[in-house]
UniProtKB/Swiss-Prot annotation:
Gene3D superfamilies listed in its UniProt record: 3.40.1280.10, Hypothetical protein af1432
InterPro entries: Alpha/beta_knot_MTases, HD/PDEase_dom, HD_domain, HDIG_dom, tRNA_m1G_MTases_N, tRNA_mtfrase_aTrm56
SMART domains found in the cross-reference section: HDc
Biological processes annotated in GO: tRNA nucleoside ribose methylation
UniProt-recorded name of the protein: tRNA (cytidine(56)-2'-O)-methyltransferase
Alphabetized GO MF terms: tRNA (cytidine(56)-2'-O)-methyltransferase activity
Keyword annotations of the record: Cytoplasm, Methyltransferase, S-adenosyl-L-methionine, Transferase, tRNA processing
Catalyses which reaction(s): cytidine(56) in tRNA + S-adenosyl-L-methionine = 2'-O-methylcytidine(56) in tRNA + S-adenosyl-L-homocysteine + H(+)
Residues at which S-adenosyl-L-methionine binds: 79, 105-109
Primary location: cytoplasm
Cellular compartments per GO CC: cytoplasm
Quaternary structure (record): Homodimer.
Location of the protein in the cell: Cytoplasm
Length: 339
């Protein structure tokens, strides 16, 4: 884990540059930033970015930087024009396997920073922006792997050769607005809210992505505004793609029928020939939470299995039973007992 320590921050002058230090820290793989001067505006700005664009990055201002740096349990790095060349030390720092704190100052860094640091590290031994120095250090530390990190937030920018492609993971209000836009009945809305409630409780125990759980649960039956057949999952996915909803939510909707539909079953049912079996943890939770409700009435697993078996759907019942077992194992409790 890498923590960035920003010192000599002056809220009245350095708001923009410290914001850029924080944004660079987040985007290039650091886990947190500590800032010496209290600055609520800066905290709100960065937390807004995290809320919209995702990640587990954190920010805290008003820290005693000397105490934080001195007592940090790991490797303490000070980025400075006067340090050792980055290429001479970066492998040693990375291969230590220890957490790292990177001190990023502005002008006139106190001598204590140099004395406390385990490594005074320079990028070029020339005057350079602290933002650039931090970006280069993190890139060398992660060896370019930071470009593979996935940030999943409400707003998700997609790679594009030209133009702008943005996909959204809608929040609860936006999901309900979408349902109303497509004419969802009150009965349907009551059902998806019930499913959301259970799915979130399961997600809490499984450390699942709650953004995807909320959106997937609330939108899983949006396709019923077009058809009440088994193809409503496919119809729902089509609606969400047209609304630029993130693929993680689209897949949860498309794969929520029972414990999924195999490619062979899809062909027999007249669905587009592909595999509709839930794969991610979030997809599995949405599917099973839906299985455990008839309308807004909660069912136990055995009741669900009996319904499927009476319809001659024994193999589907077994898949639902296995899905229930898998999620319960992750949750550490039989999800029948989660109320």
């Amino acid at each position: 884990m890498i923590t960035v320590l920003r010192i000599n921050h002056r809220p009245y002058r350095d708001k923009r540059i410290t914001t850029h230090v924080a944004l660079t820290a987040r985007a290039f793989g650091a886990s947190a930033i500590l800032v010496d001067e209290r600055d609520e505006t800066l905290e709100n700005t960065i937390r807004g970015v995290i809320s919209n664009f995702g990640g587990s990055f954190s920010i805290k201002t008003g820290c005693n930087w000397i105490q934080e740096f001195k007592h940090f349990q790991g490797i303490r790095v000070h980025l400075t024009m006067y340090g050792r060349r980055i290429n001479d030390v970066i492998d040693e720092i990375r291969n230590s396997g220890k957490d790292v704190m990177v001190l990023v100052g502005s002008e006139k860094v106190p001598i204590e920073a140099y004395e406390i640091a385990d490594y005074n590290v320079s990028v070029t031994n020339q005057p350079i922006s602290e933002v650039s120095a931090l970006a280069i250090f993190l890139d060398r530390y992660f060896q370019g792997k930071e470009f593979e990190f996935e940030f999943r937030g409400r707003i998700n920018v997609q790679p594009a050769e030209r133009g702008k492609i943005v996909k959204i993971i809608p929040d609860e209000i936006e999901c309900l607005d979408l349902l109303k836009k497509y004419g969802a009945s009150e009965q349907l809305i009551e059902h998806v809210k019930a499913v959301e409630g259970l799915a979130l409780k399961i997600a809490e125990r499984c450390n699942a992505d709650k953004r995807v759980i909320v959106a997937g649960s609330l939108l899983h039956d949006i396709g019923r505004t077009r058809t009440n057949g088994i193809d409503h999952a496919v119809a729902g996915a089509e609606i969400l793609r047209s609304e630029n909803i993130h693929d993680s939510v689209v897949s949860a909707v498309e794969r929520h029928i029972g414990a999924g539909i195999t490619r062979e079953e899809a062909a027999r049912l007249g669905l587009p020939e592909k595999d509709y079996v839930p794969e991610t943890l979030e997809e599995m939770i949405v599917a099973q939470a839906d299985n455990l409700f008839a309308g807004n009435k909660r069912l136990r697993l055995e009741e669900v299995l009996n319904i499927y078996r009476k319809r001659g759907l024994d193999s589907a019942a077994e898949r639902i039973k296995e899905l229930h077992r898998r999620i319960s194992a992750i949750a550490g409790i039989d999800i029948d007992e989660i109320r």
